[in-house]
């Protein structure tokens, strides 16, 4: 029996981060965490592309542009922050962004991790950005690299 598993190593991996700017400090923490994790896991700065977009809604079209640009990426991390407000805007954006990111990952056969925080409050969002617990930018990069290394074996 053959069991295949990826490792969270960035050595030799070309990776992109598409990070939304909306909800600034939290979004910046996600992108910074993903960047630092890439470097900590053996990646080099010249193999990392960071693209900042205005908001999470702009992530899917930017992913599509990157994927069709001719540049070969091993994985992409999509970072953003959506905080629930009093209107249905949050639900519409969260559902559409998640669906499109997933569709692009399947369509292109490329690991694209969904490191978009969807939270009921600012405090809850900060908890997912490493202040009091998990860090979605870090875990998103680790997962992206693990999947990229697994895909190299398939």
Curated annotation (Swiss-Prot):
One Pfam short name: DMRL_synthase
Disulfide-bonded cysteines: none
Keywords: Riboflavin biosynthesis, Transferase
Keyword Acetylation among record annotations: no
E.C. no: 2.5.1.78
Functional summary from the UniProt entry: Catalyzes the formation of 6,7-dimethyl-8-ribityllumazine by condensation of 5-amino-6-(D-ribitylamino)uracil with 3,4-dihydroxy-2-butanone 4-phosphate. This is the penultimate step in the biosynthesis of riboflavin.
GO biological process entries: riboflavin biosynthetic process
Enzyme class: transferase
Family: Belongs to the DMRL synthase family.
The protein's name in its UniProt record: 6,7-dimethyl-8-ribityllumazine synthase
GO CC terms of this entry: cytosol; riboflavin synthase complex
This protein's pathway: Cofactor biosynthesis; riboflavin biosynthesis; riboflavin from 2-hydroxy-3-oxobutyl phosphate and 5-amino-6-(D-ribitylamino)uracil: step 1/2
Binding sites annotated in the UniProt record for 5-amino-6-(D-ribitylamino)uracil: 22, 56-58, 81-83, 114
Catalytic activity: (2S)-2-hydroxy-3-oxobutyl phosphate + 5-amino-6-(D-ribitylamino)uracil = 6,7-dimethyl-8-(1-D-ribityl)lumazine + phosphate + 2 H2O + H(+)
Catalytic residues in the record: 89 (proton donor)
Residues at which (2S)-2-hydroxy-3-oxobutyl phosphate binds: 86-87, 128
GO MF annotations, alphabetized: 6,7-dimethyl-8-ribityllumazine synthase activity
